[in-house]
Amino acid sequence: VHPGDAKGKMISAMLAAIDFNALLPENEIPACTEGYEGFYHLTEMSGTVEEATLSYIIRDHSREKFEQRKQAVAAAAEEIDRKYGRGTVELTLRDSYYNMKEKLADCMFLIWDAEKALREVGVEPVIVPIRGGTDGARLSYEGLPCPNLCTGGENYHGRFEYIPVEDMELITKMLATLCWNLAQEYKISRRSARSDTEKPPGSFGPG
């Protein structure tokens, strides 16, 4: 539609996109939340009068609240359709990460072992929520429980992201200590298993 003849006809995709974003809670974004508070994160937007695209990341440590956030996005899409006409919004939701706590609850020894290794290299562990998706979260839901370990870096995902060499060396030492401790535990468990199945001298037959 030509802008000179647009009255009552033109629907600007970009303005509809702005309206869509305005329907989401303005204070529930990364810049206004912390700790275990969830958020909506607009990561990319592009468009013309005819077509516009908004890309979001939705995060929440609570599965229930996570589902509620997805419902809120769907409700926003329905509201835009009511305002501009059905079919205005094409909504795609794709789950990528969940809170790995659900998968680690039955194998907390993985975290305890990591804490032990940190202390052995002189670092007191600090447990903080990871406010984003991680490879460990995906691996945990693929059947390989994988808690997040620190790297020593700072300012992640920013242009000033960095990691001191000293921190890398310390974390490398911690990982080596963790592997050594796990290897020793494995040897002990193997030795114990063999002892349970070995027959005492002079015994015959099964059992």
Question: Which positions does each model-derived feature cover?
Answer:
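A short glycine-threonine-serine/GTX helix/turn-capping micro-motif
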Residues: 1-8
